[in-house]
Regions:
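C-terminal ends and interior cores of transmembrane alpha-helices
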Residues: 84-100, 312-326
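Helix-loop-helix hairpin linking two adjacent transmembrane segments in secondary transporters
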Residues: 99-104, 147-200
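A single, central transmembrane helix in multi-pass transporters
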Residues: 14, 18-22, 26-34, 165-186, ...
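C-terminal transmembrane helical hairpin of 12-TM major facilitator-type secondary transporters
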Residues: 304-345
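Substrate-agnostic recognition of the 12-TM MFS/MFS-like secondary transporter fold
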Residues: 11-29, 51-70, 74-89, 104-163, ...
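Cytoplasmic membrane-interface "Motif A"-like loop-to-helix N-cap segments
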Residues: 72-86, 296-312
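Juxtamembrane intracellular "pre-TM" segments in multi-pass secondary transporters
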Residues: 1-11, 203-244
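Helix-loop junctions on the cytosolic side of multi-pass membrane transporters
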Residues: 125, 129, 181-217
Length: 371
């Protein structure tokens, strides 16, 4: 895996991935923690579920255009445009914080996710280009580990700063009051987006525009592209089954994230957002460890034997989770869920990228997000 860091452009690529995930997660943490402080019970769970839905919806609606763009244009160019969009959106988010516009900031979660819907196929499609076919699994392991570290960092940094700011302003009792205090966090989002933009221009370009066919909006709205793209991702059984496996995993992960704060509050009697985020972070630590292990075990090949091991680990831990009543035990279970998840997803992602033709990889990766 070390040899990848000697490849020109790989370090800027990894650093850019870190900042992208850090920014996307940071805004979500601010909104989620505000919801957690103001609302409780069913309302709290419903609003957190809506936040997660806003993050997922663009990946469904933008499946066809995101795949088309990732196929047509060099991936670094797509990531550069996405980085420009991130700067613009984080500026709007910071303005909403300053004005105390909670619901506008809430809605901008959808816009930020829309940017990610275009960014994601380019990001994963670039792994094969920069790491090479022989190191595709190792590249996936590093990318997943980096993204996970960024998520963990975002959880801790934004939750810590959120709690620290509120501790000195105990009179903030409404979403608007809380957001007005979060201007420094908005500035942090903007600053990271600017650095991400600079790094995006350090990525080497390996391909040229390879698809001159225009994107027809009418066919998009009539579902012509959708039917054709679904047929594309189902052409190869290995790719389709890998996508189904990843969709199942991420569906479980989203459900777990949505209900865990309420579970921690009512079952574990834990009301501190930092502590709750720390337990969720244990899952992230596990994913990071599992991804690195999977990447190391898959040097110069894809170790598919890790897939059933990961699946059994996830199922066992999720079955045990409702029976525990202690914070430490819960954290350990979440850690094992994460390790199992890393072992599960790295071979599946690698299989998709390895099996598909280069000219269709953008569509397949966007389809993976869509499913």
């Amino acid at each position: 895996m070390r040899e990848l860091f000697r490849v020109r452009g790989f370090m800027p690529y990894v650093a850019m991935l870190f900042l992208n995930a850090f920014v996307d997660l940071g805004h979500k943490i601010v909104i989620q923690n505000t919801v957690f402080k103001i609302y409780d019970g069913t309302t709290q769970s419903a609003l957190i579920a809506v936040v997660n839905a806003l993050i997922l919806l663009p990946f469904i609606l933008l499946f066809s255009p995101a795949g088309h763009i990732a196929n047509r244009y060099p991936r670094p160019r797509v990531m550069q445009l996405a980085a420009w969009a991130a700067v613009a959106v984080t500026l709007l988010i910071t303005a909403c914080y300053a004005m105390g516009w909670f619901w506008a900031a809430f809605a901008l979660t959808l816009v930020l996710a829309g940017k990610s819907a275009f960014y994601s196929p380019a990001k994963y499609g670039y792994i094969r280009e920069i790491s090479g076919t022989d190191n595709i699994a190792a590249g996936n392991g590093i990318v997943q580990a980096t993204t996970t570290v960024a998520i963990l960092s975002g959880m801790f940094v934004f939750s810590f700063l959120f709690e620290k700011i509120l501790a000195t302003h105990t009179d903030a009792k409404t979403p608007a009051d809380m957001l007005k205090l979060m201007i420094p966090l908005g500035c942090l989002l903007v600053g990271n987006s600017v650095v991400e933009l600079a790094l995006a221009y350090r990525l080497p370009v390996f391909t040229r525009d390879n698809n001159t066919e225009p994107f027809v909006a009418r066919d998009y709205f009539r579902g012509v592209y959708l039917r054709a793209n679904v047929a594309t991702i189902r052409e190869q059984r290995v790719i389709w089954l890998s996508i189904v496996g990843l969709a199942t995993y991420w569906g479980l992960a989203q459900a777990l994230i949505a209900v865990f704060p309420t579970f921690a509050e009512e079952r574990l009697q834990q009301h501190n957002t930092v502590a709750i985020q720390a337990m969720l972070a244990c899952t992230g630590i596990g994913v990071m460890l599992g991804s690195l292990v999977a990447g190391r075990l898959s040097r110069h090949h894809i170790e598919t034997g890790l897939i059933p091991i990961g699946a059994v680990g996830i199922a066992t831990c999720l079955a045990l989770l409702p029976t525990v009543e202690h914070t430490v035990t819960t954290a350990l279970l979440m850690l094992v869920v994460g390790v199992s998840g890393g072992l599960f997803i790295i071979p599946l992602n690698s299989l998709i990228q390895y099996q598909e033709k280069k000219e269709k990889i953008g569509t397949v990766l966007a389809g993976n997000n869509w499913v």
